[in-house]
């Protein structure tokens, strides 16, 4: 009976895969306790079943200890990660510097564009002022010559009142452009202007030719001559002639 139980215990240990010596040896068990060994062997089997779990738990504990043993290596990895972070922070610093350089270049480009826009706007304002308000502008000279033609009696008698003036005809049919030519002679500026006049008399239209010369003392233009040429007729009206 005892031998059968011992064989059962060994088979159980082999099935559980537990290394080491068996719990109870045959020579260590007294013969007088043979009648009471069956419960004790059963208790031993139960104890073996219950102690198998702690061995598994012990295996987990060994694994945790092995992980803790590797903790210095993980600490080194953490250190390397910190170093990489510092390097990345250094990279960010370099990147921020490049961004500052790019922003500075962009601001400089915007400044150049603004300056170019200001210069173009200033040139346009200067041209508009010169064309409209300056005494040496072609439009200003055109206005003065037109007033002289309107007040001339021969022009009024031929064309009738009111006398209107206009410039060259554009592609859209507008009469706004006044043709002129600027040149220098004897160190003085000259300008020749041409425009057209028309009165209340139907079918009569005239072409005004004039020339101005710069006054060396005042710097303003003075009329040299103003002629009105009748297109349908070969006739010329002299409004003003200061060439002599």
Curated annotation (Swiss-Prot):
It holds the Pfam family TIM21. Its main location: mitochondrion. One of its GO terms (biological process) is mitochondrial respiratory chain complex I assembly. One of its GO terms (cellular component) is TIM23 mitochondrial import inner membrane translocase complex. Keywords: Membrane, Mitochondrion, Protein transport, Transit peptide, Translocation, Transmembrane, Transmembrane helix, Transport. The chain crosses the membrane at residues 108-128. Residues 69-89 are annotated as: Disordered. It is found in: Mitochondrion membrane. It comes from the Eukaryota. It is a single-pass membrane protein. Residues 1-18 form a transit peptide. Participates in the translocation of transit peptide-containing proteins across the mitochondrial inner membrane. Also required for assembly of mitochondrial respiratory chain complex I and complex IV as component of the MITRAC (mitochondrial translation regulation assembly intermediate of cytochrome c oxidase complex) complex. Probably shuttles between the presequence translocase and respiratory-chain assembly intermediates in a process that promotes incorporation of early nuclear-encoded subunits into these complexes. Component of the TIM23 complex. Component of the MITRAC (mitochondrial translation regulation assembly intermediate of cytochrome c oxidase complex) complex, the core components of this complex being COA3/MITRAC12 and COX14. Interacts with COA3 and MT-CO1/COX1. Belongs to the TIM21 family. This is Mitochondrial import inner membrane translocase subunit Tim21. It comes from Bos taurus (Bovine).
């Amino acid at each position: 009976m005892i031998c059968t139980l011992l064989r059962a215990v060994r088979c159980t240990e082999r099935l559980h895969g537990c290394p080491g010596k068996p719990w109870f040896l045959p020579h260590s068990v007294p013969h007088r306790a043979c009648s009471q060994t069956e419960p004790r062997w059963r208790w031993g089997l139960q104890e073996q079943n219950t102690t198998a779990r702690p061995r598994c738990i012990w295996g987990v504990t060994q694994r945790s200890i092995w992980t803790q043993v590797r903790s210095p290596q993980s600490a080194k990895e953490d250190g390397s990660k910190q170093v990489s972070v510092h390097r990345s922070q250094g990279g960010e610093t370099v990147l921020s510097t490049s961004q500052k350089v790019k922003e500075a270049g962009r601001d400089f480009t915007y400044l150049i564009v603004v300056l170019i826009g200001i210069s173009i706007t200033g040139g346009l304002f200067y041209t508009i002022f010169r064309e409209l308000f300056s005494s040496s502008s072609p439009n200003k000279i055109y206005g003065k010559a037109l007033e002289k033609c309107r007040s001339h009696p021969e022009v009024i008698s031929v064309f009738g009142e009111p006398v209107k003036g206009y410039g060259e005809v554009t592609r859209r049919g507008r009469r706004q452009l006044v043709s002129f030519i600027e040149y220098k002679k004897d160190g003085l500026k000259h300008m020749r202007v041409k425009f057209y006049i028309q009165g209340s008399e139907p079918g009569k239209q005239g072409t005004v030719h004039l020339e101005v010369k710069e006054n060396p003392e005042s710097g303003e233009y003075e009329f040299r001559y103003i002629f009105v040429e009748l297109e349908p007729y070969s006739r010329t009206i002299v409004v003003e002639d200061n060439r002599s």
